[in-house]
């Protein structure tokens, strides 16, 4: 995974924004929200509640979790030669205090975006980079997932 991360960083350095094509993955509409795949996290009591809103900056997705964990998924093929940059904007209203995010018990984040590269026939063979909004670490931190060596939390 270290090589993958290094490769990703090199691609980002070599390819400036002027060379990148913009691909909007989400439009954040009620119709789109109803079509997204929702996956409840094993062991969670409830699913996260999702809704769509808008403000001066455009549409957004709001997620509220109370003893809940789930994710929204959308499969998209991206050509990294044409679109090597990911741009994530998020607003967190409440940090998760008192947890150790790099442990299985505390592996929780106020916001998280998974970028998964399919590398084999099963989900366990995939590689992932998880862009996270950490409540307890400095900007730029990264850590291997406590669940698998094939996933890095950034």
State where each predicted segment sits.
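Solvent-exposed strand-to-loop "edge" motifs in beta-rich extracellular domains
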Residues: 89-95, 118-120
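Extracellular carbohydrate-recognition regions
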Residues: 20-43, 131
């Amino acid at each position: 995974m270290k090589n993958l991360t290094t490769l990703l960083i090199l691609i980002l350095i070599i390819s400036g924004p002027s060379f990148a094509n913009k691909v909007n993955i989400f439009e954040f509409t009620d119709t789109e929200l109803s079509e997204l795949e929702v996956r409840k996290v094993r062991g969670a009591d409830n699913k996260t509640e999702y809704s769509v809103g808008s403000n001066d900056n455009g549409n957004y997705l709001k997620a509220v979790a109370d003893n809940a964990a789930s994710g929204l998924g959308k499969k998209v093929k991206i050509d990294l030669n044409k679109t090597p940059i990911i741009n994530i904007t998020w607003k967190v209203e409440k940090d998760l205090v008192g947890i150790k995010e790099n442990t299985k018990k505390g592996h929780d984040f106020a916001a998280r975006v998974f970028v998964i590269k399919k590398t084999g026939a099963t989900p366990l063979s995939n590689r992932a980079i998880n862009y996270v909004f950490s409540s307890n670490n400095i900007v730029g931190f990264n850590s291997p997932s406590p669940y698998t060596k094939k996933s890095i939390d950034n």
